[in-house]
Amino acid sequence: MGLLRFAKNVGKSLFGDDDDDAVATEALTKELDDLGLDAAGVEVKKEGEEVVLSGAAASQSLKEKIMTALGNVKGISGVQDNTEGGTEGVFHTVEKGDTLWAIAEKAMGNGAKYEEIFEANKPMLTHPDKIYPGQVLRIPV
């Protein structure tokens, strides 16, 4: 799939700037567990400001959730998807003033489909109104 870019200076803080990649990788893997995302078969490794994924996820949807969960972490500028199979996902970077309704209108042609975007981004999203500029969201297709 390639490299998916994220805003490095926004997101959940899981590790410090001085933590080495091994410590950060452990924190990222724990975050997936805490979110209830089954990353069995997917190897997660932090390399500099990027996360590299390899192996195979159970589904395309799960792989995309793993990518957005890890990429929306403070200090991560990209997720390199080297996993087996799958297709190119559709993503949207939240801009100032965006709402899920507006994103659904733009990406899916119908603002009322905002709930589909919300569901596609659970458990990272806990409420449809809790999005922030720089956050990357999955758009279900």
PLM features: what roles do these ranges have?
Residues 62, 99, 136:
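Residue-level recognition of oxygen-bearing side chains
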Residues 69, 73-87, 115-141:
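Extracellular LysM carbohydrate-binding repeats and other cell-envelope/extracellular binding modules
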Residues 47-52, 57, 83-111, 115:
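Primarily a LysM-type cell-wall glycan-binding module
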Residues 61, 112, 126:
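Residues that form or flank phosphate/diphosphate-binding pockets in enzymes
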Residues 1-85, 130:
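Secretory N-termini
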Residues 66-68, 94, 106-109, 132, ...:
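Surface-exposed beta-strand edges and their flanking turn/coil or helix-capping segments
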